[in-house]
Amino acid sequence: MKALRIILAGIILYGISNNSYSQTTDIQDATIYKTELFGSAATGSNTPFWMVSNRYGIVPQEAGNGLLNAGVFHNQHFGKGFRWGAGLDIVAAVPRYRNVFIQQAYAEIGYKSLLLSVGSKERYNSLWDRNLSSGDMVQSTNARPIPEVNLSMPEFTLVPLTKGWLQVRGDFAMGRSFDTDYLKDFANSKQVYIKNVLWHHKSFFFQIKDTENDFPLSLTVGVQHYAQWGGTSTDPKIGKQPQSFKDMIRVICGQKGGSDATLSDQINVLGSHYGSYDFKLSYTEKDWGAHIYYQHYFNDKSGMEFANKTDGLWGLQFDLPFLPWLNKVVAEYLVTMNQSGPMHFILFDRDKWQGGRGGGNDDYYNNGEYTTGFSYFNRGIGSPLIPSPEYNTDGSLGFKNNRVKSWHFAAEGDINTQLSYRVLFTAMNGWGTSYFPFLNKKFGTSSLVDINYTHPKLQGWKFSGSVAADTGTMLGKSVGFSLGVTKTGILKAW
């Protein structure tokens, strides 16, 4: 029976892959290069928040920094419906623990709408606007990419026999952390953490949209799941975590750990898990569009069953291409205050809260065994509005401020054909965690103004400048500016 289900799933996947809604032939057959020179200065000890956040982890947090980024990327179609690609991207940055590092190194092969990728690659899987959103709660652009094997359907693809009304996309990946040396340098001597962590994530989205007659209303619904597992603890008494093939299946399916797992993982599920339900309703006309969305975040089964009420990211976006100077506007509200209640009482009421389900104090992005939390190189993988462990000045690990209420506003537009801008403003409130609340609420604002300039006689060149500021007690006070130059071009067209 299981084999039959696998065969049927394969047939359905093959059928869908041959009905691409966003054609892969749009990918340019070429070998391209990209170089970027960036530098910033600030009055505080840290670079202003929005100069650092959602940059795939390449901009150093410390004030007075600079970086050089150089990459080569190849895409080429071959045969009937096949394509392959590869990329190498190297960053040199100061000040930083390691001044030169590989940001991206991957190879991939695709058929129709399917893509198999191996290595570290900057991806964007979120439904929210890439330039203006504060960030996806499960997989944002805030941290460096984790090396992984990723099988995906990256673009929405038509489902057969639905008359163009139903499209799907998703991915499935297994990866591994390579930040052990960094954590050893950052963490104080009292910190216990798991090194060489293994990762799993998957997502599935379906979209109800009229692709034939342009009916303006559409609905997108999705689910995302991320998990940390395996690895070896720096505490010899804890040692190596379960990481057999059977354990991998347990992590994928969200099941309890075996007899070799910790007591907590035997009671709940193996590893540390994070996820979300994503909802987006869109109304799109030829010259304008409106989108309303909600991302319901969860750490365990209680959150999956909405015991954490309305926690998550709420958003509104307007697309305004008919306006001369304003193209898009985004407003978001992030709230993580409920967390299924203030106390984790799973051990006190076993009849009500069965194994595999948490019972309060979900402690978003944190975990008892995986003390680094939902981060890579100490940058949060999810929303940057829950401040990353990199902001911990005492060498401690984990997220110290995950009970937040934040408002975020953003806009972008074109002043003329050569000059564009982006504006971000965020007001943040933080109360610490349920176990370790702040004595006084922390508050702060972060703002950014980006200006980008291109010239028709300087093909492939982009010049950028930014001014940013942080205020209040949340992140500290800092005012800064940055300058950047980017050059892209084609080495060879195929």
Give, region by region, the residue ranges found by the protein language model:
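Extracytoplasmic loops and strand-loop junctions of Gram-negative outer membrane beta-barrel proteins
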Residues: V52-Y56, D89, L132-G135, D185-K190, ...
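Short loop/turn motifs that connect adjacent beta-strands in outer-membrane beta-barrel proteins
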Residues: Q23-Y33, H74-G85, Y97, G110-L114, ...
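Bacterial Sec-dependent N-terminal signal peptides
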Residues: M1-I27, G489-W494
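Transmembrane beta-strand segments of Gram-negative outer membrane beta-barrel proteins
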Residues: Q23-L68, F78-L88, V168-M174, F463
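Exposed, low-structure sequence patches enriched in small/polar residues
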Residues: F215-A227, G231-W494
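Internal, well-ordered domain-core segments that constitute the primary functional module
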Residues: R123-D235
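Surface-exposed loop and membrane-interface regions of Gram-negative outer-membrane beta-barrel proteins
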Residues: G79-Y111, R123-N142
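Sequence/structural signature of outer-membrane beta-barrel proteins
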Residues: A42-G44, D89-P95, K121-M137, L158, ...
